[in-house]
Amino acid sequence: MTNIRKTHPLLKIVNSSFVDLPAPSSLSSWWNFGSLLGVCLAVQILTGLFLAMHYTSDTATAFNSVAHICRDVNYGWVLRYLHANGASMFFICLYLHVGRGLYYGSYLFTETWNIGIILLFAVMATAFMGYVLPWGQMSFWGATVITNLLSAIPYIGTDLVQWIWGGFSVDKATLTRFFAFHFLLPFIVTALVMVHLLFLHETGSNNPTGIPSDPDMIPFHPYYTIKDILGFLIMLTALSTLVLFSPDLLGDPDNYMPANPLSTPPHIKPEWYFLFAYAILRSIPNKLGGVLALVLSILILAVVPLLHTSKQRSMMFRPLSQCLFWLLVAVLLTLTWIGGQPVEHPYVIIGQVASVLYFLILLIFMPLISILENYLLKW
């Protein structure tokens, strides 16, 4: 008799995605981050659901409701810090996942890659709106500064900002709608993840060599299920260590002060995972130019497949491209550092040089060095 997992209409979809899925035999730990992102999303949705049961999205009570969750709700502090630091783990896994895609040429699966970029934007929007909800100083001023950027859009900008705010400043209406969207977006993200996987399973996984692996496939279960579970354990250990030992390590102390529209914090900055984009935004002394650079810093990923000039897919056997890739990583780390610094010499010029380098590496140096490598290999 055929196994029920192969015949049942629902189970056979799960079976072909997670059990009998043919996978390349050479996948390294860099392929663990997709499943880790799935776990992060599940943790965020679950903790977020329980937080939403106690949170109130009203300017008068939002800050106090978060304090109430931490002090009075059973294990509320665990929920709150799991959710806050879970977002950090989410972005660590996201950036490593995208980096893996860039290094090993996974972007040549263009549909999967483009859905991934949409997912990245959706997760960033979700995280931004979530940061506003505790209604601390940095929540309020972060929301004010970032939404205000839309006023740089010609003609409709000002109207658009007031429409998003629901008034003439960030206030009760803004907080309520941000809560509504923050609740809704993760479910849209979940749907997009399914589309992402659908497109991935049309082509099958890439592998570290970038060479087609059709002749040498192994079943996903038990090989990669066990490997993924090890990844889960390592990530959840790291997350619980962060939550239980230094839950505020990645947060901003200003957010423990209730939002006050009459007093601006000395340094307005977003959460650490947006600092690289914030540094690029600040490096251009023009509002519209800065906003365009900010959007393009992520959207540039969409042109990477078009600029692939190498005859090889992966960077595994391309040392010159590897050097450029790690230079790009160094530039991004520099931008992250600069985003958290005040706008003064020498940070301004360092940020501007790093921003220019970021775009140059992706748009010009990578394609050129690939052409050189083809020539050196007589291809």
UniProtKB/Swiss-Prot annotation:
The keyword Metal-binding applies. One of its GO terms (cellular component) is mitochondrial inner membrane. The chain crosses the membrane at residues 33-53, 77-98, 113-133, 178-198, 226-246, 288-308, 320-340, 347-367. GO terms for molecular function: metal ion binding; ubiquinol-cytochrome-c reductase activity. Keywords: Electron transport, Heme, Iron, Membrane, Metal-binding, Mitochondrion, Mitochondrion inner membrane, Respiratory chain, Transmembrane, Transmembrane helix, Transport, Ubiquinone. Binds 2 heme b groups non-covalently. It is a multi-pass membrane protein. It is found in: Mitochondrion inner membrane. Its cofactor is heme b. Heme b b566 binds at residues 97, 196. Heme 1 (or BL or b562) is low-potential and absorbs at about 562 nm, and heme 2 (or BH or b566) is high-potential and absorbs at about 566 nm. The cytochrome bc1 complex contains 11 subunits: 3 respiratory subunits (MT-CYB, CYC1 and UQCRFS1), 2 core proteins (UQCRC1 and UQCRC2) and 6 low-molecular weight proteins (UQCRH/QCR6, UQCRB/QCR7, UQCRQ/QCR8, UQCR10/QCR9, UQCR11/QCR10 and a cleavage product of UQCRFS1). This cytochrome bc1 complex then forms a dimer. This is Cytochrome b. The gene is MT-CYB.
